[in-house]
């Protein structure tokens, strides 16, 4: 057997590929367009193809040359909430339409398992905290809507073609496996990496977007999870499907929420740096609070996160940033 990782040259995807190669139990095939990913981030023992999953002839070639692929892990999607508000059609074209084209080729080639990188953004402003897998999904931005549409498309493809799927709904992803070759870099938009860039002196200050949320300190609250733990969850989800289980979704998070100001203070403690901060207006499409209940993943999949507190997650990312002050970029 073999696993195809879509988007395997990106931040989370490269952790996934490293984990698969580390286990050494099956062949690992990677597809990435390198629009946001880095070729050098792909483990040398993985088979790499550069291309777009929406190119069906290209994907047919990948499956034809790797007939032992029976499962796909899908990370290849645009994922910036703010950008999705400005360019919604870009997200529906790449994310949602891309899923249709992928599933058509998977069905044609007889590949029947897919583990999908979904998002907490499908819940929008959640009706309950912590968020359960059964919490109503009402996205408030095109990014979340595009991912929810992808989940719906997979549901009907399962019924029609028997392609079994597991959407893994991530909450905030942060940190770095010290053995991996990539953390978030290049035009960074995520809170923790920017905070650490300020600690390094790469940036002058961190902007805290919004101080009027319905939270104790006025900044929005998020649940954080380490990419190493996400990689383990993906492996468990593939095993779950291969055992003949039915399609189902899982939330992946630490089940503990931290506000932006709490993350800032924790980073100051871990790094020993002042980290200047300035408050700014809210970004459109950001909910007040997103905290997961990952009890289902822990019970059904046997998922056991190793990075179970925010300071540990920050410390792992800071170790990488400290040793790579200019970040990581193979584009010259």
Swiss-Prot record:
Q: Which residues bind NAD(+)?
A: 11-12, 32-37, 52-53, 75-79, 94, 119, 143, 147, 171
What does UniProt list as this organism's lineage? Answer: Bacteria, Bacillati, Bacillota, Bacilli, Lactobacillales
Native source organism of the sequence: Streptococcus thermophilus
Named cofactor requirement(s): NAD(+)
> Which terms are listed as keywords in the entry?
Carbohydrate metabolism, Galactose metabolism, Isomerase, NAD
Annotated metabolic or biological route of this protein: Carbohydrate metabolism; galactose metabolism
Tell me the Pfam families matching this sequence.
Epimerase
UniProt lists the family membership as follows: Belongs to the NAD(P)-dependent epimerase/dehydratase family.
Protein name as annotated = UDP-glucose 4-epimerase
The residues annotated as the active site are 143
């Amino acid at each position: 057997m073999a696993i195809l990782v879509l988007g395997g040259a990106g931040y989370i995807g490269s952790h996934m590929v490293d984990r698969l190669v580390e286990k050494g139990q099956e062949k690992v095939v990677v597809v990435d367009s390198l629009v946001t990913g880095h070729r050098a981030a792909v483990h040398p023992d993985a088979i790499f193809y550069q291309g777009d999953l929406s190119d069906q002839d290209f994907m047919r070639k990948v499956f034809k040359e790797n007939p032992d692929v029976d499962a796909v892990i899908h990370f290849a999607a645009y994922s910036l909430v703010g950008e999705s508000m400005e360019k919604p059609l870009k997200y529906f074209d790449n994310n949602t339409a891309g899923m249709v084209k992928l599933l058509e080729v998977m069905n044609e080639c007889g590949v029947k398992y897919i583990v999908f990188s979904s998002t907490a953004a499908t819940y929008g402003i959640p009706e309950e905290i912590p968020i359960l897998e059964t919490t109503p999904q009402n996205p408030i931005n095109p990014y979340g809507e595009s991912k929810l549409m992808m989940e719906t498309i997979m549901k009907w493809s399962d019924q029609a073609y028997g392609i079994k799927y597991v959407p893994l709904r991530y909450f905030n992803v942060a940190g770095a496996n010290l053995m991996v070759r990539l953390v978030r870099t290049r035009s960074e938009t995520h809170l923790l990496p920017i905070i650490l860039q300020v600690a390094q002196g790469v940036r002058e200050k961190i902007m805290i977007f919004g101080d009027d949320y319905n939270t104790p300190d006025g900044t929005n609250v998020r649940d954080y999870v380490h990419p190493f733990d996400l990689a383990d969850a993906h492996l468990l989800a593939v095993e779950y499907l291969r055992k003949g289980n039915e399609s189902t979704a899982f939330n992946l998070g630490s089940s503990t929420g931290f506000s932006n100001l709490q993350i800032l203070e924790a980073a100051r403690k871990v790094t020993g740096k002042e980290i200047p901060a300035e408050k700014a207006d809210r970004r459109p499409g950001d909910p007040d609070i997103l905290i997961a209940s990952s009890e289902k993943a822990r019970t059904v999949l046997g998922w056991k996160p190793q990075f179970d507190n925010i300071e540990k997650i920050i410390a792992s990312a800071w170790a990488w940033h400290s040793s790579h002050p200019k970040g990581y970029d193979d584009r010259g």
